Amino acid sequence: MDMTLPIALLIDLMFGEPPAIIHPVVGFGKVIEFFDNKYRRRSPYLDFLVGAISSLVVIGLAFILSHLPNFLPNPFNLILSIYLLKSSFAIRSLHDHVKRTITPDLEEKRRAVSMIVSRDTKSLDEPHLNSAAIESLSENINDSVIAPLFYYLIFGLPGAVVYRAVNTLDAMIGYRNEKYEYFGKFAARLDDLLNFVPARITVLLFLSLGGRKVIRYYRMAKYKINSDKPIAAMSAVLGVWLEKPNYYKFPGRRPENEDIKRALKVYWIIVVEFLLIVAIILYGG
């Protein structure tokens, strides 16, 4: 029996993320940051071309890194495989980051939320801060748990590591603004492609908790290709509105501190559901 995934999961649940200085995802980020800082924007065509090449360099490095265990003897190949696989998902870290947003202190909440969302939190009131925390948790159920393990099931370690590299690229340069509109377009579209199936699997996992209401809210999620789908499902299950002002809003009552706690309970149910499915696929036969 291949113990790579069980040990990687155990390490994640016990210790969380490895130090930034040795974290592959941080390394991927530094490589794309280097290209981003060096390249001066010129034209839509050149910006797209340079952005695509820069992204492919990072993806190539991730692919090579994921194959390094094949060239190492036992037990070093297993150790590196476990380390790389664990680095591709973040179950405990996601929980811990969101848990820090559960506080009655508005400024402390604002600081905690600013660590997990890209939007400006300075002008957000408490309900919108609560919403932002729950939205981030919902979106990252897919990005940080379901999708990397989905690609591990299909393609093994390279699938998980390459997915994490693409997701990191999207998080850093996949924005619709003047600086990244074309430079980050390749990374953003590739991330959309890779997340299409996992995001919908994530929604299916919510059905055990919300049934038809999840389906109804899923049909409302027409704002983005993937990321709003798990957010809609979480809104349906919790019965609270989740809103990114000027982008989307799913109906419900006002989200409170207690709803972040409830969202974390939902998170663990979804994680356990998916891990059971993964275990059956990998070890059931």
UniProtKB/Swiss-Prot annotation:
GO biological process: cobalamin biosynthetic process
Compartments (UniProt record): Cell membrane
Gene Ontology CC: plasma membrane
InterPro entries recorded: Cobalamin_biosynth_CobD/CbiB
Keywords associated with the record: Cell membrane, Cobalamin biosynthesis, Membrane, Transmembrane, Transmembrane helix
Summary of the function given for this chain in its UniProt record: Converts cobyric acid to cobinamide by the addition of aminopropanol on the F carboxylic group.
This protein's name: Probable cobalamin biosynthesis protein CobD
High-level lineage: Archaea, Methanobacteriati, Methanobacteriota, Thermococci, Thermococcales
